[in-house]
């Protein structure tokens, strides 16, 4: 007499179509929920990186002034800005407009505070979806000593000024590394300010987040971010 063997079920059978649809739906929902946070992270990193680049450019200008004994001028602001009365647009070596340019203007005795052909320059590009000004901040950084008025959205992106407190988009670093404001003519540096006139703030935004870079009157640089509690120090 034969004993009936138990039926063996195949536990390796594939999942059903309904189960597959459910799994894919869960994956899609998780991915959709993660996209905004990823985009926010990328936006923050891009803006933070640009703010740090601006701060680094100030530090480069200061160190170059001390090293070479030449005037170094930092020009900055929205694309299309110029070097003042001379009207030279801020561009890189390829002719592309840039948000910041460091110019080696030569020894103080011969410097003219304008961008001339052949002068050494350093530039940085403007990242996509980043601009000058603020979108959330309501006040300037407390340690921003720039004399130009601050009024959101501050489309100039700066509080830099000349010795008479008129808004500008430049700062001159003397050979001792001290930043000062100046009021150029069409051919010369015009009036160069004393120590204390070069403090300024730069403000950049992604449309939903704001960062600032402050240049102290003696040349130190700090990067700040805006939050509900105000600017970080």
Where are the language model's segments positioned?
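Glycine-centered recognition micro-motifs in short, flexible terminal segments and loops
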Residues: 5-28, 33
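N-terminal helix-rich module
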Residues: 2-7, 29, 33-47, 52-59, ...
């Amino acid at each position: 007499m034969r004993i009936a063997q138990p039926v063996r079920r195949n536990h390796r059978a594939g999942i059903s179509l309904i189960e597959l649809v459910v799994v894919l739906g869960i994956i899609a929902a998780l991915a959709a929920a993660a996209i905004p946070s990823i985009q926010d992270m990328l936006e923050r990193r891009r803006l933070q990186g640009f703010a740090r680049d601006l701060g680094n450019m100030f530090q480069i200008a200061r160190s170059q002034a001390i090293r070479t004994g030449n005037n170094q001028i930092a020009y900055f602001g929205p694309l299309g800005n110029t070097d003042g009365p001379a009207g030279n647009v801020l561009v890189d070596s390829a002719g592309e407009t840039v948000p910041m340019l460091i110019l080696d203007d030569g020894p103080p005795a011969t410097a003219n505070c304008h961008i001339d052909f052949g002068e050494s320059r350093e530039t940085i590009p403007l990242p996509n979806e980043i601009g000058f000004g603020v979108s959330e901040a309501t006040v300037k950084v407390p340690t921003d000593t720039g004399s130009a008025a601050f009024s959101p959205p501050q489309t100039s992106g700066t509080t830099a000024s000349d010795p008479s407190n008129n808004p500008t988009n430049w700062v001159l670093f003397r050979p001792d590394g001290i930043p000062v404001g100046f009021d150029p003519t069409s051919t010369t540096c015009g009036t160069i300010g004393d120590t204390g006139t070069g403090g300024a703030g730069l403000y950049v935004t992604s449309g939903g987040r704001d960062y600032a870079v402050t240049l102290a009157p003696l040349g130190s640089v700090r990067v700040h971010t805006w939050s509900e509690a105000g600017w970080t120090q």
